[in-house]
């Protein structure tokens, strides 16, 4: 039978919705043609009764295996470094054997869930197609195809990139070539496209009777923007919630155009990375965040596509976490300072291998080293390989690997005491951590949080206005559900801070919203307040401008100091302000 749905209420992207809980289907339940792999058993190396996260070394790519406390499994991605690798030379073959060892299974393994974060080779591999004249097929395709490793799957989760249309009515899904791609894909949420994506979509959504679809037919769940996304059943006590896909509700740099939708014919479309799936997993007090190659800035690549700040949409749903998998292999286009400071992890993993992209970026490494978290300052940084790239993207500046952990191979995280703590095992040892109560909110006083900086007239800096809050206390403070407003009794409607948002001790958090809320000229106020019947104003600042001052801010001295009365070009969004006024 198909995957079973239960229902519960969760909070995602700032709105309450009733969403399905996607229960794992049993092996072979979708039909006799499907392989009946064996589920994880107690004979494996995974830690029973705890949450296990395996970051699997696939060099410059991604693969994660999550094993729940009762043995339920989720594989997120299985990337390859070459489109034409086959057989024993693939990551798929090697990772299949690794999964067998973890699960204690000698043959084909049944995976409860498989998730493709987005449609790039280094995350999903390269699918074969019935029209191929030579042997190809690796990554997730080889893992699940009957002619490959023949693993079975309960539910295969895919972002809504597009579907097959059979434009030429020949009954199969044609991909064409890179030089002359077919027109058989109806793109839904896409910018840059590739043969990797076309082949993936043809495999997932092609003819039901196509032989290589036997193990996935009837098991694919496409995450559309029109329906609530499911949470996953990884066993009692585990919450696994999809919080982003397809760049839902994210605007491009103009502040008007949605990143979602079909942008494939545009001259400079969004990057495929922007459409990555974001997933949060919680067990006890332990919280983990992973989001594919999600971007965290507005910029245009020299390769003809745009980066968009999708990370801003994850701040509220993710909140403060114990462990973060850095987005996009530690790229400087991702894991921006606000994102790292808001999530405030105690540990982080970067999946990278030999590359020429400057991964990981020194800015990301420094942000993780300096982040203020529940145990003080600094997150432990684990790498799949060390070194990955020897230099930064400029080809000259050395990558600073000082203090990073794990030189080569898989890294295993396992919770302890049903989520009260966790241990990370790496190539030369292990480290033990305490899990904190971020998921239930901070214990600090929200009235002590201060407005620290704000920008009212964006232009070249991006599409959004923003207000930065600063937590001067030594405790995590929950600000979710509170408001940012302008003038009392007038102006625009108050902006509610997404539920679950917390600010760590000494931390900064930036609330972004589309331009048009704060006045560019005249007299205006910025207020941070609670609204419950009446208003309780915790902090406010007023200004008066005779003309629009684009890309300038009002800020305090340092963090939480006196206000500067002169507008400033020293924009320090998400970080400490200058030590003096302009």
What are these regions (language model features)?
Residues 321-392:
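Internal alpha/beta domain cores that form substrate/cofactor-binding pockets in large enzymes
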Residues 84-86, 121-129, 133-136, 164-169, ...:
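Extracytoplasmic/secreted cell-surface and envelope-processing proteins
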Residues 53-55, 63-67, 73-77, 110-117, ...:
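Structural recognition of the beta-strand scaffold that forms the well-ordered cores
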Residues 69-74, 79-157, 313-331, 344-349:
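Active-site metal-binding motif and surrounding structural segment of the metallo-beta-lactamase
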Residues 442-582:
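Intrinsically disordered, low-complexity linkers and terminal tails enriched in Ser/Thr/Pro/Gly
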Residues 59-63, 72, 80-83, 119-124, ...:
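Solvent-exposed loop/turn segments at secondary-structure junctions
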Residues 36-52, 58, 98, 107-108, ...:
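Flexible, acidic/histidine-containing loops and adjacent segments that form or flank the divalent-metal
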Residues 2-33:
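Secretory targeting and sorting signals
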